[in-house]
Regions:
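Residues on the lipid-exposed face of transmembrane beta-strands in outer-membrane beta-barrel proteins
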Residues: 3-9, 49-53, 106-110, 121, ...
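Transmembrane beta-strands of outer-membrane beta-barrel proteins
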Residues: 16-20, 47, 61-63, 117-119, ...
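Transmembrane beta-barrel strand/turn architecture of Gram-negative outer membrane proteins
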Residues: 41-59
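Outer membrane beta-barrel strand-and-loop segments of large Gram-negative receptors
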Residues: 1, 97, 112, 116-166
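Outer-membrane beta-barrel channels and translocator barrels
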Residues: 11-14, 54-58, 101, 111-115, ...
């Protein structure tokens, strides 16, 4: 189930867009060989925001924020313990949350009939990435998952296009 609400505004040289998406996901797992089952539900709000400014008829500046979600799959959520190796057991975590990746970017663009330039700077980060971790309890290696991952990324890009035809 999903719903989206958005708003767009333009005033002279300034433009903007804002949006928010709501997503509800329900997972239900039944095992054929066992009398076991579990379910998981996710409710996520996913915002986006963009501002633009027309510097000149052929030049613009844009800044934006976006969020992306990655929901955990059944394997990550499955609470039942795999004991096929009694010295190293594994199980999922039904309390996992959706992983949320945030992205901020600024872009300058200039274009003409002969030459196009785009310069972008992007910063993205995740504070609750789904990661596997292990620990020893009572002499047994336990492996499971949690929202403990963190990452940051900075990206600079330059795009040049030259039209060589007369």
């Amino acid at each position: 189930l999903a719903a989206y609400l958005g708003y767009q505004l333009k005033y002279k040289k300034l433009g903007g867009k804002a949006g928010i998406r709501y997503e509800h996901t329900f997972m239900d797992a039944d095992y054929k060989n066992k009398d076991e089952k579990f379910d998981a539900q996710f409710d996520d709000l996913v915002p986006s925001l963009m501002f633009s400014y027309q510097l000149a008829p052929t030049q613009s500046l844009r800044a934006s924020y976006n969020m992306r979600i990655s929901r955990p799959g059944i394997w990550f959520l499955n609470p039942f313990t795999d004991t096929s190796n009694p010295t190293a057991i594994s199980y999922g975590n039904p309390d996992l949350e959706s992983e949320k990746a945030h992205s901020l970017s600024v872009t300058f663009g200039s274009f003409s009939q002969k030459f196009n330039v785009n310069v972008s700077a992007n910063y993205s980060f995740v504070n609750n990435g789904i990661e596997q971790y292990s620990f020893i309890k009572d002499g047994v290696m336990n492996s499971t998952y949690d929202n403990i991952g963190k990452s940051k990324n900075i990206n600079l890009s330059l795009f040049l296009n030259w039209n060589m035809s007369p």
